[in-house]
């Protein structure tokens, strides 16, 4: 049963496999696997599917079993292990099936088990260098047919080093090699090798390394017993030293000069120099060839072996060879050599660095080098013993250093001007010091031009951004240089500059560097910066802010912006006159804004004007809004009234020499923002009798009051004038001044009093120092106390002022307190007891910040002579009685506490110190809260110790009991636990670079703890992986932060976490901070060279992963444009730089930061000339050579111009057509490219000869400026020589050779492999070094030498015969490479395609050719493939090194470049145009219901068509054979066309919703009688007249009918208006159909058989039939337009029969019908005795005709009842009805009839009842007969195009005249007239 079940399963799997692959099928990793037969071990191979979950089955488990890996709960897996289970040696096969449990898809793999027939060793090289990386050797096993086994995993081998018979010249050669295990190395082996090495077994893969130089042989055999007869595999390895010769290039020397050679060795990647002479190597000069006039007996050069110095003796050449001293090693390895040419000096050359231009700049350092060349321009080695005399004018140059031989000078340019440098090669100095003068010195001169450096003025300009481009302009001045400058702007979006230096602002915000480069040397330039920035701040410039009422103020504005770059540098804008400013006045009525704005000035950019209208001050607000910019500035301005005197209003009283404090009001008030700047200036009427001084008491807060100190110089009266104003200040730099006058009177004093200005302490506690003596006052030693000195007259009245008295101030301790003249007595107005104001004299005492007790005494001894003399008082005057007063002061320091705020970590081991300093020493401390901290004051130390108790905050207040202090000293203490940790770090770092991470610990209020608390928290910072290193730094960002240095050491991502331990011992971690280490970010290619209109894509490598969007930008957008995808398009001639930025967002600031960037250079140029790039000029017949067009430089390759728009066309021609064949690049694939893509061609040599190859490059649009000088075309021509291949004519045999490149290998294969015993050897003689090596397995390998060798292949047949082949092997360098394309594209009519079809996968194969065009059989090149853009094709590596696979994915042109990685000169370019291969080209989107006829010219090789398929048949159903598709649903779909095993292309199709479905009635043309088609209504789905897209073949039209597209639509009908009680479906059948000829849908309408009721209703009421169509089962709304179809139900009579008699000879009948039918209605009678004529016609609604039916012959019916038929018919519609007519004769009994009485008459009169009875019977019979024929007679009538019934054409029109009324064929005649458009019912009889 199991076998039967397995058979059923296999049958099922076979059926599933036969069904074919699905559209998105999964794949296995291998189709067939070959496993070796083993007994001791089991060899496994793992099968893996790309996706899905599978159940696995082996058809023959005894041959190969299958075991799933990683079964899930559904007992399925994606991987399984195949194991060889065969027990007997044989070749058997088992089929492995894998069935997807979800989709049912079945995958298949064949497992073959066979015996190993042969093994061989595979290696990458046969040469090893000492101390180099080891070499991996691998066994490859073959079966008897030469097939390679898939795996040898687990098979045990024995590897041994054996004696090499051919290496006898090497001593102990078997010790030169060592076998390593992978466990000893740093390399990762396969997993099974690791397991075998652990079991001390050797597998199929090993490592070997060289121990010493020599040759060694390695042998491997299978240990499995069954393979004991399999011949072991052997390989011979050569171990060498890596030796270099320095210099390695050819050297040119002068006679008498020398050069020192070095021999170097490479070991482990390091170059070390060998000491020469050496016991291993020696240098030799060979092949000395003297010049034409040289001495053959003398050597050209000599070599000093002890110094390795080569000295040139005479003209000629010689070879320097490095060789082995050991004879046995001389042929084993190849050592470098060099050629030495001894030449005469030809001329001198000058170079300068930097710049390489001889236009220099003063102050710069330059290096000048004089080079020697021979007459062939070969650079001669400048040795130290030559002498070059150089003259550098000291006036222009400062020589900093020079070389001994005079060839190198380091100088500084000093002076502006023009000069010349002279140099002459004069002599050569030999080793003995002898000077050999050249007979003809080599001399040259270099002219030099020197300029001063270029500077631009101004250096910085700033402008605000405005939406209008070019809002601001400025002319920049340049100084220095040659005067001819090239101006440039780094950002044209910010600012542009003209050739004359006129700068214009652009449309973007930012900064632009304006540079002026010297045209003569672009290295020299000057620059300035233009900033176009958003306004950041606005302020008013210093100006006058006070105005008298009625005056105007000008208020200038400064608007500033932030400089870009993040440095927060603020700069004032140069011009903001275009700003739309809004002005607001805070207090209305004080100032009124005036229209207009101030022009820009040196200190402002704009401004406003206001007018003072009333006294007062106000704030003026100016604001600016634009977008997100909101700026505002405020300024305070004031308006004042004229100044007037208040106290005294007119007179003031003072003593002689004293002063009076006068109060004035009005005038300019003290500036509200800076009142201290207020001043009053006073003048007197008589300056000889008074002194004036201004005074501003601090106690006054009335800014309208002004105080004047007037000093009396003589008794009397005086008029005082006062000027009031403010001194200049920051907010009032230009104040106003107002004047006023008052009268002044003097009088003498009598006594003085002195009192302190004292305030009691705030606390109720008293100071211990206070005593009962009120004259003892404690004061602060930091604040100057004031004493109140008063003067009284004899009557005890207080004087206004006494400052003119001679007051002697004394202090008992001047070191503590003193009175300084700089602090004169101040006069303060105070109210006395009477309410009158008196002046108090306040004297400030100057303290000196020292503590102690002192007494201050003030004594008035008289008038102050100095004051009197300075006031010029009049003498003599009465003496003053001495007066005095004193007071004692105690001076102490103010109490201070530090710090004033501290945060304490809540930890028992932490306490904070508050240092209390100074004060009186008597303090009282209290806290705002009692349970947060504990405070203890240590009086001895002056420290308050604070211990944390609970989290919270508390304010500690220190009160000084003995000091007048405004407030106690306070310190706020915060106690907090740890809330969180915060890490700030940039989340990306480039590998090898560093960033800093900052860690803070935050308390409960999110405030940071001090860093000194971190040791109590055990703070640590850790990384999740070791891709970064963390080092704590000692540097501190602040007192709250610890800094770590992060260095990226490996690429990847990790996270940072900081952690601390809290008071409870719990570990608190920060949120992980992600950080990525990324590789360096680079843009490729490094330089982009483009033609105008050409495009190239810039790609990137490295950078952060996953890489965010790269922001591309270009420095000069007028030269080129760059898209977001990196596509660079050339616009104009010039240079630029494309910048690629990788940005990230700073987590803390939210700002975008640049984490990496790179630049590439862009050059947009025009083609000055074209060149044909041909790798060789001589080629052999039958060979091919690629050619392509380039510019005049290497950068001007096809990538630069191949895809330019408008493009170039390339036209190739040869002068001799029979010599060369020109072929397109894709000729082998049957693709013929148009001329615009033919920048690259292939050339085939046909016959020998020489021909010219010419290309003409034409510009499609010469005005686009792509060619130099707006040329229309450029051309180039080369000569190509084609020569015949060398052949033997006698005997006439083919002599072939194997062509190999250096360091390549090939496996030779013969037709006798496996059948005969083959041996290989090289036949070169012992004197010739072979250029190739071959082993016994036929592996032919070439070395680095070029040349030819001969190999011999001998086959020993088992039957005794031997065969020998001798083949020449040529080793030659690769000259060029050529690319071919596959597969070949076949078309129906063999026509060539113009592009690669879209969706196709093609393979490009690279062929390598030598300098004759022959193809290499083996090469060692490593190829690179690149495209100019990546959006049209996808490129990937092919199955071999010389292939690549390209898949076309989009329509467009892509350029492909192929080059050798080691030899960039070996390159080729190809065009890859991609076009649609499937027609038709759809002008617009398809709609549901469209029928599409797809076509393509692509066929198979046999010319057979491929298979069509659709990615979604539910949307677009397609016939697989013909390509007919029907759009069934809305959506996007891909149509595939596939030629099995050959090609596959596709086309994208979009199916949309039709906007409307419109029905249109089709008016038919004239039709014949026999046509019976239904009436049609054309249905247009969508906006097109036809729903058939594309050109359809007859076969496709047949398939369209089979697809039944009409099922997509449904037809509906309805009466309009709906006046009937039955639906239209009871009358009409409406069916959808599709016309394949016209491509149109239509609805076919057929009328049913009508009942009498239906016919009556339809005839009596007017209605229309409306036919519409809709999409079947559509869920979207579409406009439906119906069509009205006219119809007629036919003719209808109001009577079913007519009865006539001789008494009733006439009757009326009314016939209803359509008006167009009734107009031509004909009536026919079946008997001449009955006549009908129209009586009344009505064509209204309903339409009818009334007929009168009468009997012509009165005797009719006298012979018996007459039965006949009236037929009403329409010749237009062929409609007809038949009405039976019966005529009966009745005898009148009232008198004789017209013919007299008769017996028959009497009979009738007697038997009247009988006659009526007979009449009834006859009439009934007639009616029955007519009804029978009407119903049962076969009808030839059908529904015509307008649903009109028609008669058979065989009936005569005169049928009724010749036929009996009772004939069964009594139907209306047929008419040939075509009916009108409409619907008509059949001619059914009415009963």
UniProtKB/Swiss-Prot annotation:
Q: Does the keyword Ligase apply?
A: no
Read off the InterPro entries from this record: Big_2, Ig_NUP210_4th, Ig_NUP210_6th, Ig_NUP210_9th, Invasin/intimin_cell_adhesion, NUP210-like, NUP210_Ig1, NUP210_Ig15
Q: Which residues lie on this side of the membrane: Cytoplasmic?
A: 1830-1887
Per the record, residues carrying Phosphoserine are 1874, 1877, 1881, 1886
For the region Disordered, give the residue spans. Answer: 1853-1887
> In what way does this protein cross or attach to the membrane?
Single-pass type I membrane protein
UniProt KW keywords: Endoplasmic reticulum, Glycoprotein, Membrane, mRNA transport, Nuclear pore complex, Nucleus, Phosphoprotein, Protein transport, Signal, Translocation, Transmembrane, Transmembrane helix, Transport
Q: Which family does it belong to?
A: Belongs to the NUP210 family.
Q: Any remaining note in the record?
A: Recognized by antinuclear autoantibodies in primary biliary cirrhosis. Knockdown of NUP210 causes nuclear membranes to accumulate aberrant structures termed twinned and fusion-arrested membranes and nuclear pore complex to cluster. Induces cell death and chromatin disruptions.
Q: Which PANTHER family match?
A: NUCLEAR PORE MEMBRANE GLYCOPROTEIN 210 (PTHR23019:SF2), NUCLEAR PORE MEMBRANE GLYCOPROTEIN GP210-RELATED (PTHR23019)
Name-wise, this protein is Nuclear pore membrane glycoprotein 210
Taxonomic source organism:
Homo sapiens (Human)
**Organismal lineage:** Eukaryota, Metazoa, Chordata, Craniata, Vertebrata
Whichever gene encodes this chain, its name is NUP210
């Amino acid at each position: 049963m199991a076998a039967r079940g397995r058979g059923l399963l296999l049958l099922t799997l076979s059926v599933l496999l036969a069904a074919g692959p699905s559209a998105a099928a999964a794949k296995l990793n291998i189709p067939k696997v070959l496993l070796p037969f083993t007994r001791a071990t089991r060899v496994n191979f793992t099968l893996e599917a790309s996706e899905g979950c599978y159940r696995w089955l082996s058809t023959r488990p005894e041959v190969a079993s299958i075991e799933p890996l990683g079964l899930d709960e559904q007992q399925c897996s994606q991987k399984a292990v195949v194991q060889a289970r065969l027990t007997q040696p044989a070749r058997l096969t088992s089929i492995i099936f894998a069935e997807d449990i979800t989709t049912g898809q079945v995958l298949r793999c064949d497992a073959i088990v066979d015996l190993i027939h042969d093994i061989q060793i595979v290696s990458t090289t046969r040469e090893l260098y000492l101390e180099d990386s080891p070499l991996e050797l691998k066994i490859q096993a073959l079966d008897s047919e030469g097939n390679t086994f898939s795996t040898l995993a687990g098979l045990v081998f024995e590897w041994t080093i054996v004696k090499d018979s051919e290496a006898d010249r090497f001593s102990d050669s078997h010790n030169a090699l060592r076998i390593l295990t992978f466990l000893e190395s740093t390399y990762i082996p396969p997993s099974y090798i690791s397991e075998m090495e652990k079991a001390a077994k050797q597998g199929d893969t090993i490592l070997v390394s060289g121990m010493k130089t020599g040759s060694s042989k390695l042998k491997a055999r299978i240990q499995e017993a069954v393979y004991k007869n399999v011949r072991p595999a052997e390989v011979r390895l050569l171990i060498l030293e890596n030796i270099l010769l320095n210099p390695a290039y050819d050297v040119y020397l002068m006679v008498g000069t020398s050069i020192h050679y070095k021999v170097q060795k490479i070991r482990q990647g390091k170059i070390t120099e060998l000491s020469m002479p050496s016991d291993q190597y020696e240098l030799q000069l060979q092949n000395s060839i003297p010049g034409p006039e040289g001495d053959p007996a003398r050597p050209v050069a000599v070599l000093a072996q002890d110094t390795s110095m080569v000295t040139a003796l005479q003209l000629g050449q010689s070879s320097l060879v490095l060789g082995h001293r050991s004879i046995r090693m001389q042929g084993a390895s190849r050592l470098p050599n060099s050629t030495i040419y001894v030449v005469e000096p030809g001329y001198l050359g000058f170079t300068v660095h930097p710049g390489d231009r001889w236009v220099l700049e003063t102050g710069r350092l330059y290096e000048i080098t004089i080079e020697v060349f021979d007459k062939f321009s070969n650079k001669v080695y400048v040795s130290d013993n030559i002498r070059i005399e150089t003259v550098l004018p000291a006036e222009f140059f400062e020589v900093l250093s020079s070389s001994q031989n005079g060839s190198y000078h380091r100088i500084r340019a000093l002076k502006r001007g023009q000069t010349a440098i002279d140099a002459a090669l004069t002599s050569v100095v030999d080793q003995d010091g002898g000077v050999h003068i050249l007979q003809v010195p080599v001399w040259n001169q270099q002219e030099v031009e020197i300029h001063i450096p270029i500077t631009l003025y101004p250096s910085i300009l700033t402008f605000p951004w405005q939406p209008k481009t070019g809002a601001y302009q400025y002319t920049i001045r340049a100084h220095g240089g040659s005067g001819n400058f090239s101006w440039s702007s780094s950002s044209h979006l910010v600012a542009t500059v003209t050739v004359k230096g006129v700068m214009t602002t652009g449309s973007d915000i930012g900064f632009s560097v304006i540079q002026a480069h010297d045209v003569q040397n672009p290295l020299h330039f000057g620059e300035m910066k233009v900033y176009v920035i958003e306004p950041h701040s606005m302020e008013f410039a210093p100006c006058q802010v006070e105005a008298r009422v009625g005056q105007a103020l000008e208020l200038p504005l400064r608007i500033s912006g932030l400089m870009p770059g993040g440095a927060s540098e603020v700069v004032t804008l140069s011009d903001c006159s275009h700003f739309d400013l809004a002005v607001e006045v805070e207090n209305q009525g004080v100032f009124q804004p005036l229209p207009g704005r101030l022009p820009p000035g040196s200190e402002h950019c704009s401004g406003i004007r206001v007018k003072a209208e009333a006294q007062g001050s106000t704030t003026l607000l100016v604001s600016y809004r634009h977008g997100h910019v909101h700026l505002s500035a405020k300024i305070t301005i004031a308006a004042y009234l004229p100044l007037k005197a208040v106290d005294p209003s007119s007179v003031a009283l003072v003593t002689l020499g004293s002063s009076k404090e006068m109060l004035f009001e009005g005038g300019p008030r003290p500036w509200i923002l800076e009142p201290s700047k207020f001043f009053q200036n006073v003048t007197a009427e008589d300056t000889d009798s008074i002194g004036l001084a201004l005074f501003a008491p601090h106690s006054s807060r009335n800014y309208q009051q002004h105080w004047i100190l007037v000093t009396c110089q003589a008794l009397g009266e005086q008029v005082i004038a006062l000027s009031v104003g403010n001194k200049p200040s920051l907010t009032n730099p230009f104040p106003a001044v107002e004047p006023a006058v008052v009268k002044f009177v003097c009088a003498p004093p009598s006594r003085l009093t002195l009192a302190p200005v004292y305030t009691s302490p705030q606390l109720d506690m008293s100071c211990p120092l206070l005593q009962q003596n009120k004259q003892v006052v404690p004061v602060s030693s930091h604040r100057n106390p004031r004493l109140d000195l008063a003067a009284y007259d004899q009557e005890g009245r207080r004087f206004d002022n006494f400052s003119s008295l001679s007051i002697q101030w004394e202090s008992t301790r001047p070191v503590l307190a003193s009175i300084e003249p700089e602090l004169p007595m101040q006069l303060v107005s105070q109210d006395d007891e009477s309410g009158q104001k008196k002046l108090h004299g306040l004297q400030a005492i100057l303290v000196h910040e020292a503590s102690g007790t002192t007494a201050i005494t003030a004594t008035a001894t008289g008038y102050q002579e100095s004051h009197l003399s300075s006031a010029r008082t009049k003498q003599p005057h009465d003496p003053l009685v001495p007066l005095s007063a004193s007071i004692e002061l105690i001076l102490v320091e103010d109490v201070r506490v530090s710090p004033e705020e501290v945060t304490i970590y809540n930890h028992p081991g932490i306490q904070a110190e508050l240092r209390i300093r100074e004060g009186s020493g008597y303090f009282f401390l209290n806290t705002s809260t009692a349970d947060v901290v504990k405070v203890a004051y240590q009086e001895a130390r002056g420290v308050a110790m604070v211990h944390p108790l609970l989290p919270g905050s508390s304010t500690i207040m220190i009160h000084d009991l003995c000091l007048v202090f405004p407030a106690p000293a306070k310190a706020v203490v915060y106690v907090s636990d740890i809330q969180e940790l915060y890490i700030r770090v940039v989340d990306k770092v480039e590998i090898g670079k560093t960033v800093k991470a900052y860690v803070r610990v935050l308390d409960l209020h999110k405030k940071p703890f001090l860093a000194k608390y971190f040791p109590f928290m055990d703070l640590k910072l850790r990384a999740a992986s070791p891709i970064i290193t963390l080092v704590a730094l000692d540097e501190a960002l602040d007192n709250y932060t610890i800094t770590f240095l992060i260095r990226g050491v490996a690429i990847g991502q990790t996270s940072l976490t900081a952690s601390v331990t809290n008071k409870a011992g719990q570990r608190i971690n920060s949120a992980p901070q992600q950080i990525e280490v990324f590789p360096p970010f680079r843009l490729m290619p490094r330089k982009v060279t483009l033609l105008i209109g050409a495009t190239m894509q810039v790609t990137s490598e490295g950078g952060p992963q996953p890489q965010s969007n790269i922001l591309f930008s270009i420095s000069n957008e007028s030269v080129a444009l760059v898209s977001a995808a990196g596509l660079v398009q050339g616009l104009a001639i010039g240079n630029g730089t494309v910048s690629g930025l990788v940005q990230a967002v700073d987590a803390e600031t939210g700002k975008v930061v640049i984490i990496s960037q790179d630049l590439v250079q862009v050059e947009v140029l025009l083609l000055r000339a074209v060149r044909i790039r041909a790798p060789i000029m001589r080629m052999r017949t039958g060979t091919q050579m690629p050619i392509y067009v380039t510019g005049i430089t290497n950068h001007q390759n096809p990538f630069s111009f191949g895809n330019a728009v408008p493009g170039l066309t390339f036209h190739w021609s040869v002068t001799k057509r029979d010599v060369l064949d020109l072929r397109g690049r894709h000729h082998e694939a049957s693709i013929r490219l148009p001329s615009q893509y033919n920048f690259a061609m292939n050339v085939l040599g046909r016959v020998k000869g020489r021909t010219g190859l010419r290309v003409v490059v034409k510009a499609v649009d010469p005005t686009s400026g792509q060619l130099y000088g707006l040329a229309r075309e450029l051309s180039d021509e080369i000569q190509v020589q084609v020569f015949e291949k060398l052949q033997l004519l006698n005997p006439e045999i083919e002599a072939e050779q194997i062509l190999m490149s250096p360091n390549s290998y090939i496996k030779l294969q013969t037709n006798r492999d496996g059948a005969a015993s083959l041996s290989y050897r090289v036949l070169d003689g012992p004197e010739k070094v072979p250029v190739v090596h071959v082993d016994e397995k036929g592996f032919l390998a070439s070395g680095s030498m070029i040349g030819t060798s001969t190999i011999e292949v001998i086959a020993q047949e088992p039957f005794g015969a031997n065969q020998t082949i001798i083949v020449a092997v040529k080793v030659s360098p690769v000259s060029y490479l050529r690319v071919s394309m596959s597969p070949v594209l076949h078309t129906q009519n063999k026509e060539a395609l113009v592009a690669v079809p879209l969706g196709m996968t093609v393979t490009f194969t690279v062929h390598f050719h030598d300098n004759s065009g022959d193809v290499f059989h083996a090469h060692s090149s490593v190829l690179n493939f690149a495209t100019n853009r990546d959006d049209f094709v996808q490129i990937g590596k092919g199955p071999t090194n010389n292939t690549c696979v390209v898949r076309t994915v989009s329509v467009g042109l892509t350029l492909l470049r192929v080059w050798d990685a080691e030899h960039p000169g070996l390159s080729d370019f190809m065009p890859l145009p991609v076009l649609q291969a499937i027609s038709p080209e759809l002008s617009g989107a398809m709609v549901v219901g469209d029928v599409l006829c797809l076509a393509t010219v692509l066929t198979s090789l046999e010319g057979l068509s491929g298979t069509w398929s659709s990615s979604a048949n539910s949307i677009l159903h397609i016939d697989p054979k013909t390509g007919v598709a029907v759009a069934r649903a809305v959506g996007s779909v891909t149509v595939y066309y596939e030629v099995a095993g050959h090609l596959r292309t596709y086309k994208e199709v979009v199916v949309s919703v039709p906007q409307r479905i419109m029905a249109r009635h089709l008016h038919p043309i004239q039709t014949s009688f026999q046509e019976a088609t239904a009436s049609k209504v054309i249905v247009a789905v969508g906006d097109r007249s036809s729903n058939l897209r594309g050109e359809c073949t007859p076969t496709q039209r047949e398939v369209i009918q089979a697809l039944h597209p009409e099922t997509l639509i449904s037809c509906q009908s309805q009466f309009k208006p709906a006046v009937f009680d039955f639906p239209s479906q009871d009358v009409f059948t409406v069916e959808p159909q599709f016309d394949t000829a016209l491509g149109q849908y239509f609805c076919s309408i057929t009328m049913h058989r009508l009942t009498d009721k239906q016919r009556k209703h339809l005839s009596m009421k007017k209605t229309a039939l409306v036919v519409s169509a809709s999409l079947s089962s559509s869920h979207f709304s579409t406009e439906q337009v119906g069509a009205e179809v006219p119809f007629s139900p036919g003719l209808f009579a109001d009577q079913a029969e007519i009865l006539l008699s001789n008494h009733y000879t006439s009757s009326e009948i009314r016939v209803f019908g359509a008006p167009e039918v009734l107009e031509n209605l004909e009536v026919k009678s079946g008997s001449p005795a009955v006549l009908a004529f129209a009586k009344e016609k009505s064509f209204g609604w309903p339409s009818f005709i009334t007929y009168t039916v009468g009997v012509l012959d009165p005797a009719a019916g006298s012979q018996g009842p007459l039965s006949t038929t009236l037929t009403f018919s329409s010749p237009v519609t062929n409609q007809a009805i038949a009405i039976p007519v019966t005529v009966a004769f009745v005898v009148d009994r009232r008198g004789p009839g017209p013919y007299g009485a008769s017996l028959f008459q009497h009979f009738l009169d007697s038997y009247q009842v009988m006659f009526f009875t007979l009449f009834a019977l006859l009439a009934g019979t007639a009616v029955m007969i007519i009804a029978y024929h009407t119903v049962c007679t076969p009808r030839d009538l059908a529904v015509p195009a307008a649903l009109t019934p028609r008669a058979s054409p065989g009936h005569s029109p005169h049928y009724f005249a010749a036929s009996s009324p009772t004939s069964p064929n009594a139907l209306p005649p047929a008419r040939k007239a075509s009916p009108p458009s409409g619907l008509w019912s059949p001619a059914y009889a009415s009963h």
